[in-house]
């Protein structure tokens, strides 16, 4: 499924040191990829139900100009697992083939695009109408807090990511100040939803912000990861 380990690590710009620090065998990662490939058609069905029920032909209600979606490939799933276990081993150390869907919250991704930043309020109110937002329901422990029976709610508090110097006034009435972060290189509002038994990641930004976000994700992040590990190696 994943093929040769060395080729995989090179493809996803994962240093050997990072792979070793993740603490999962190649056989375990391949088992997760195979299980995921078996389930992926179901993820597409859930994505399509979300779009049909809540997004398609509802521009006036959502405030969206356009949108796009993606489902993670098996390779990108394994890449994320490796990186997350290195970044936060305590949180992800219990992840296995049997429970990885309780840990990975962005297998289904939705990105809504706005013409103007002010249109975000329309979309935010629309989500609140269809998904409960209660702090007592937020998932802090991926295993203990995963509720099989509860659906259509926000798994964590909505979060605003901004660049330093951006104005946060538009979000102040809706998002807690602790969840407005101004130390990023991109702009976006993030939601994690529980929908039909699956976690679904929703990101909202303007068309202008989308252009910069693409540059940041595809160029800056891989470069930062490689630079970090090169620096670590030089210090040893």
Model-assigned labels for residue ranges:
Residues 137-140, 144, 148, 213-228:
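Flexible glycine-rich active-site/ligand-binding loops centered on an Asp-His dyad
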Residues 1-110, 118-121, 125:
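Charge-rich, low-complexity segments
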Residues 229-236:
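Conserved small/polar residues in nucleotide/adenosyl-binding loops
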Residues 110-114, 200:
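Oligomerization/assembly interface segments of phage tail-like spikes and tubes
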Residues 129-138:
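A common structural junction motif
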Residues 155-195, 199:
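Aromatic/basic-lined ligand-recognition segments
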Residues 124-130, 205, 218:
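"Short basic amphipathic alpha-helical interaction patches in structured regions
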Residues 192-225:
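Feature marking long nucleic-acid-engaging regions of large polymerase/nuclease enzymes
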């Amino acid at each position: 499924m994943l093929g040769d380990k060395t080729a995989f690590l090179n493809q996803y710009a994962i240093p050997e040191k990072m792979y070793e620090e993740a603490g999962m065998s190649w056989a375990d990662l391949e088992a997760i990829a195979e299980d995921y490939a078996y389930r992926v058609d179901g993820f597409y069905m859930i994505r399509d139900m979300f779009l049909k029920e809540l997004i398609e032909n509802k521009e006036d209600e959502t405030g969206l100009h356009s949108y796009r979606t993606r489902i993670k490939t098996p390779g990108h799933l394994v890449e994320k697992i490796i990186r997350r276990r290195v970044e936060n081993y305590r949180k992800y150390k219990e992840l296995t083939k049997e429970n990885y869907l309780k840990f990975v919250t962005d297998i289904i991704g939705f990105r809504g695009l706005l013409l103007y930043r002010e249109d975000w309020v329309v979309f935010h109110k629309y989500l609140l109408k269809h998904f409960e937002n209660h702090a007592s329901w937020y998932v802090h422990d991926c295993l203990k807090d995963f509720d099989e029976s509860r659906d259509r709610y926000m798994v964590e508090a909505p979060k605003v990511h901004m660049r330093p110097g951006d104005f946060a006034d538009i979000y102040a009435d809706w998002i807690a100040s602790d969840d407005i972060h101004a130390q990023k290189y991109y702009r976006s509002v993030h939601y994690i939803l529980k929908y039909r038994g699956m976690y679904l990641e929703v990101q909202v930004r303007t068309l202008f912000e989308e252009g910069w976000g693409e540059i940041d994700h595809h160029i800056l992040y891989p470069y930062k990861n490689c630079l970090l590990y090169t620096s670590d190696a030089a210090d040893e």
